Amino acid sequence: MVQIKQEFIEEMVAHAKADLPNECCGMLAGPDGKVMKVYRMSNVEASPFRFVMDPGELVQVDTEAGENGWELLAISHSHTGSEAYPSDTDVRIAGGTAGLWPDVRYVLVALMDMDDPSVRIFAITNDVVTEEPLEVV
């Protein structure tokens, strides 16, 4: 189970709103399933339908997380007009990242209802999507 502070949820929602009309993306890192930092990443695709993280930023995040003894807990991104559930594209991309980060989770921020955004977390393994509890503290 991933544990995250409410302020980090609010930070991810603010990032999603700021990047409209495009999807935003980021990484969550910390020890023992506890998010210590949310990394706001650049979506070099600049698209409302998909995201591609800046490779240089990925290296920086991976380096900083390693220096702090943290693991990369989750990849986050927003859905600008659909629910907080992995799309077929999300599932396909997750299959490609499994070799790099086999235990990484996927956090989705949905802005279908701008007044009540939805934030959910999933495991995606062998094309199977499983929602997991996200403990907000």
Describe the function of each predicted region.
Residues 1-72, 83-137:
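Conserved beta-strand-loop surface patch within small alpha/beta domains used
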Residues 77-81:
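Histidine-centered divalent metal-coordination motifs
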